[in-house]
Amino acid sequence: MSTKLEERQKLRQDEIITAARRCFRASGFHAASMSQIASEAKLSVGQIYRYFSNKDAIIEEMIRRIIDSRIEGMQDKTVVEGMPQALAWRKTLNEDDDALMLEMSAEATRNPQVAAMLTAAEARMFANACAHLKKQFPHLSDEHIRCCVEITAVMIEGSIYRRLTPLKVPSEQLEPIYQDILNMLFAEK
């Protein structure tokens, strides 16, 4: 059972993360400063440092929360249900998270610590997706499952990136093609 102090600390961390998300969306990770985050959170910089040792610690917590949310969103769903439609229509679970992950990827090209955080988060997401798919498709080998996860990750992440540009092909034409790809990936071997 958590104490009132722990609850207050968690609430304060949530407020800081919310403020940081707004700052990072507006200015990018690289340009957003701790003073901007403090101002947005209506705290002093010193108060922020009580909860997070530096900006990278805030980024790390943000990545952890986004990945936790994505893993939770994966539960109780099969890969083939809804995914062709989501890909074809470029639907997303959380547009803000997608934009922040794109921003984090850009920051990772400049900051080895952020690159390491993203690598660890991706490994966690990949392992969880493999375990989730293995439950749905126990007839597939572990190697094939890993290939399926990699291919679906490329399709999902590519769709997230491509959401920034207009569709060149109607979604109605793309959806059955995505369905065929997924059917082929998860067919009995």
Task: Annotate each PLM feature.
Residues 115, 119, 135-189:
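Hydrophobic/aromatic-rich alpha-helical bundle segments in the mid-to-C-terminal region
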Residues 41-52:
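Short hydrophobic/aromatic patch on the recognition helix
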Residues 28-29, 50:
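Helix-turn-helix/winged-helix DNA-binding modules
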